[in-house]
Amino acid sequence: MKALTYHGPHHVQVENVPDPGVEQADDIILRITATAICGSDLHLYRGKIPQVKHGDIFGHEFMGEVVETGKDVKNLQKGDRVVIPFVIACGDCFFCRLQQYAACENTNAGKGAALNKKQIPAPAALFGYSHLYGGVPGGQAEYVRVPKGNVGPFKVPPLLSDDKALFLSDILPTAWQAAKNAQIQQGSSVAVYGAGPVGLLTIACARLLGAEQIFVVDHHPYRLHFAADRYGAIPINFDEDSDPAQSIIEQTAGHRGVDAVIDAVGFEAKGSTTETVLTNLKLEGSSGKALRQCIAAVRRGGIVSVPGVYAGFIHGFLFGDAFDKGLSFKMGQTHVHAWLGELLPLIEKGLLKPEEIVTHYMPFEEAARGYEIFEKREEECRKVILVPGAQSAEAAQKAVSGLVNAMPGGTI
């Protein structure tokens, strides 16, 4: 099969690799019909994450058709159309029973990213996200082996197009969990730092949950314009405003700040010189600019929700300010499985339209170019979907939009 493989920072290529096969009795093999490039993939692409090896297959946002099942798979059969959570969970351990699937104790043979973990078990394995998280081949490929086939795969209704369902794999549940963690309710005020795919969908979720005043902070004008035009967010460009938190506070009741802030940036994917040195030492770091801004912008007693990925040290983390303001922090990888039953009806009813953030539909063969476009924000790129078998951008979009490919094997 063809897969996108890693060969060093900024060097990925589509090449032929062995087809995956069933290894455990509850595995399934999936034919990929749509796969996406995630913002967190850029950390891997840029060489910012330790234990990424030459030949590794990226990709944790994917869906497709079941083509083979292990003998113990009970919930699926060949031909089923499913979307796959990026978190691999066993469904039966202490944490899975708490619906904290990202903390599953039984799927990750790696050590995770915690620097001071002691004897605490590693978190769940993640598809295509380094050997820290299990070294499980990802879904930027024509086929993929999916472990725990009775637990993770989520059946997609026949009339729901791939581009509407695909982001149930990661960024829509991530956005939803971030908004829920922020305890957004009718009339809330919230500031979202980062207008990438997760940030934009977080704004959509916040609006649906009743947020009245939403600020969005970024420095890409086209993203800010989209957030303002589509979701009614108040845009702040930090290239033009050196202190967005101050501007936010000045526009809130009593100059108290917003009820909640959501950091959809995480450690900066571009990386400063300091961050690069720390990466080489296997101690990833972040300047912490976004997080400091979040702490400054939120009101006393407010909530800081962090869906953005962090690892290692945070430089200049103003813990004293957080203590003084009595802030609550909620963060971590997304417990995808817990949210799917809640989110699917919202998509079916048109209350959430995750596909609207997509700007680029591309043939899978052009995946390396897709990474370049997404990384450099060329062509006003917000989100890239890659489609195996498509021969052109038009064919790729046709294959995953509307009712095309809504049933295995063809068009309705």
UniProtKB/Swiss-Prot annotation:
Q: Which InterPro entries match?
A: ADH-like_C (IPR013149), ADH-like_N (IPR013154), ADH_Zn_CS (IPR002328), GroES-like_sf (IPR011032), NAD(P)-bd_dom_sf (IPR036291)
**UniProt superkingdom:** Bacteria
Q: Which residues bind Zn(2+) 1?
A: 38, 60
Record-listed Zn(2+) 2 binding positions: 90, 93, 96, 104
Keywords carried by this UniProt record = Metal-binding, Oxidoreductase, Zinc
Q: Does the keyword Oxidoreductase apply?
A: yes
| E.C. numbers | 1.-.-.-
Query: Which cofactors does it use?
Result: Zn(2+)
Entry GO MF terms: oxidoreductase activity; zinc ion binding
Annotated cofactor note:
Binds 2 Zn(2+) ions per subunit.
Q: Which CDD domains match?
A: FDH_like_1 (cd08283)
Q: What class of enzyme is it?
A: oxidoreductase
**Which SUPFAM superfamilies does this entry report, sorted A to Z?**
GroES-like, NAD(P)-binding Rossmann-fold domains
Annotated coiled-coil segments of the chain: none
Q: Which family does it belong to?
A: Belongs to the zinc-containing alcohol dehydrogenase family. Class-III subfamily.
- The name of this protein is Uncharacterized zinc-type alcohol dehydrogenase-like protein YbdR
The organism is Escherichia coli (strain K12)
